[in-house]
């Protein structure tokens, strides 16, 4: 019991030090909450607005310890555990938090700046992935982009850092303004899937998990987006890739993909 209590206290002290470092770095005044959950939220909020720069190893060690503890708390989902629920191998369908998946790569639906979501505690997939991976991910994206914008339909790859996934594939899908995608936007969405699979093949990856690119705030209709996703992935000439996971969050997306697969 004493060891458990000591471990909990060490973890809370670690979060407090991480918050203090980022608050000082960002010149933000904040009161550190007493609740462990609220401390985690404050740390995430500070991470979400962090301007990319070099970070000291001491901070990274503290951050990594906390994020890996959070990953363990959520539970890691392996490919093997998904295969028992396979709709049709090698294409798997899973509903849940993509940051739990232990695939070679997960796909992030990014924006054109490709530096993550800057809105504190926002629940978009971009924010969730960056928050779980750690600040190294934003720095890696910053170093790759060099102030450029990522073209719609293009993608690039980074390490996954504190995620169970080894890599993250960042792609930008089309934004649909009137719920009726044009032929160009449909091709751009297909390009997102092709480009991610090309990068996966180039890097010798064997498994990849796709989120529902461009649905949600980008307003691509869910049914048509899923049709494009499934047809594009199935038609892609795979060599190294053995397992493709379609990851969904909403019940309606699960029903759509289940019917298509």
Explain the meaning of each model-derived region.
Residues 1-261:
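Macrodomain-like recognition of ADP-ribose-binding/processing modules
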């Amino acid at each position: 019991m004493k060891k458990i209590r000591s471990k909990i206290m060490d973890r809370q002290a670690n979060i407090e030090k991480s918050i203090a470092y980022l608050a000082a770095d960002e010149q933000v005044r904040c009161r550190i909450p007493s609740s462990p959950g609220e401390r985690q939220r404050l740390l995430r909020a500070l991470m979400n607005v962090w301007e990319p720069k070099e970070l000291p190893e001491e901070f990274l060690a503290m951050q990594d310890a906390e994020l890996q503890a959070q990953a363990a708390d959520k539970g890691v989902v392996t490919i093997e555990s998904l295969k028992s629920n396979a709709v049709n191998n090698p294409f798997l369908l899973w509903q849940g938090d993509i940051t739990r998946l232990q695939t070679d790569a997960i796909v992030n639906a990014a924006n054109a700046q490709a530096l993550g979501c800057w809105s504190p505690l926002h629940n978009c997939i971009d924010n969730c992935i960056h928050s779980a991976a750690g600040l190294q991910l934003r720095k890696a994206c910053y170093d790759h982009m060099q102030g450029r914008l990522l073209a719609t339909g293009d993608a690039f790859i980074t390490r996954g850092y504190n995620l169970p996934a080894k890599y993250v594939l960042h792609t930008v899908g089309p934004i649909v303004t009137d719920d009726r995608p044009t032929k160009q936007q449909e091709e751009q969405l297909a390009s997102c899937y092709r480009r991610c699979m090309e990068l996966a093949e180039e890097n010798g990856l064997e498994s990849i998990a796709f989120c529902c690119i461009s649905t949600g705030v980008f307003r691509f209709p869910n049914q048509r987006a899923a049709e494009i996703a499934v047809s594009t992935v199935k038609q892609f000439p795979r060599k190294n890739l053995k397992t493709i996971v379609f990851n969904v969050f909403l019940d309606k997306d699960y029903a759509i993909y289940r019917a298509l697969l």
